[in-house]
Amino acid sequence: MIGMSRNLCIVTTIVALGAVSLTARPGPQAPVAPPQGAPQRPPQQPGEISTTITGGGGAAPRLAVPDFIALAADAETTATARLVGQILFDDITFEREFALIPRDTYATIPAAKSFDDVPVDRWRELNADGVVVGTVQKTAGGVHLEVRLVNVRTRIASFSRSYDGSNANPRLFAHTISDELHETQRGLRGVARTKLTFDSDRDGERISGTIENRSVKEIYISDYDGSNQRRVTVTRSLNVMPTWSPDARSIAYTSFKRIVPNIFISNIYQGTMEELTQGGSSNTLAAWSPDGGKLCFVSNRDGNLELYVVNRDGSNLRRVTNHPSADTVPTWSPSGSQLAFVSDRTGPPQIYTIDADGLGLRRVTTSESYADRPTWSPDGREIAYAARTGPGNDIKVVELASGQVRQLTFGEGTNESPSWAPNSRHLSFNSTRSGRTQIFVMGRDGKNVKQITNAGSNFQPNWSK
């Protein structure tokens, strides 16, 4: 039976992890409402501008990103200025849209004390096209930041913004600046304010009464770069396969807290937990529709494992697949008109697509001995998945229009559970390449691999939209 049994069990409240509220203007806006204390954009000021800076000969612009200028000598303001500059450098590096001048070369450049004494000529000696200059000032309510991207050829700011907010999470200022800078300068939606969710056994607890003394797994979230890791569930049971709602406010996941697996939804800001599915059947592997109004999941309620779709409030349950074999691991197309999933209907598990109404079945993987965990790219062009490549698995991507497959990982441990970043330029995945299973991120070309978890073992990441 499907229902929305509302369990007001309070889960861990997540503080200062939302996106930033921005003034209205063309381009993507923050995906979620900001939590208390997040930096706010004041009304657009006459001096705030956005023009495009370019590199020489059509190359990517070369930028310098030194520490921000602390307009007060206290330790907190100084630390914030240093941290925002470093995190902004890291955020810009991650997107690979600019050529960053290494920070260890900045020692020869005199530090500016204000926007009026930026040593533009010295930055030009390092072949910079632009330098990001920012100031941090303490206020009664927190801090005030101003930032400019100065074109070293024209000495004019190509980008100018100001922000006010709490100093509780200074990383969020850097993430906000990075996303706005990429949007205005490169026409790109950045991912610095996005989140990851994953399941982890890091707490070291064991589930009593299980023959194998199974580890407790809880749901965690973090910033895209692995910072600000927070525990979401506190059930002391097995909680796995989390997935973000499109508004990045809720997480659906499979929980064994009542022995039989069912799907729960936790709102990370309200601290509530809802039980979407109930009963004696197995209900697992939830996937949100792009509009957030439905979830697809896997259930054996009618015998074997099939795909079902249900409204967010638990109403209007309908079956999508109907085959004697097992159909599992659904993922929605960005349009919401199709689903990709795994089925063993022709032998070993393979990736298929099907229309959301259950028609139009198509096999996607044709050359794999085993394919699992599909994830549809937000631009709709590709599906990433885990494929058997030997003793372990590797991440591959298939282009839907041509069927062309490219491999992203190559036998460094077992690599599974890919999940796309919302701009289709990066993927997260879990891998055993460093020993225990950990979460990694990489570019869509398989380059710039970075491990972002270390505590315990961590599995099945999902990137917020």
Regions found by a protein language model. Give the residues of each.
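Short beta-strand->alpha-helix linker/helix-N-cap micro-motif
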Residues: Q45-P119, V132-K138
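Amphipathic beta-strand/beta-sheet edge segments enriched in Tyr/Trp
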Residues: S114-E180
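Structural motif
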Residues: G142-H144, E205-Y220, V260-F264, N304-Y308, ...
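Residue-level detector of Asp-centered blade-edge/turn motifs that repeat once per structural unit
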Residues: G190-A192, P246-D247, P290-D291, P334-S335, ...
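Hydrophobic beta-strand positions that form the internal "hydrophobic ladder"
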Residues: L196, I251, G292-C296, G336-A340, ...
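Multi-bladed beta-propeller domains
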Residues: D223-V240, S266-T284, V310-A326, I354-D372, ...
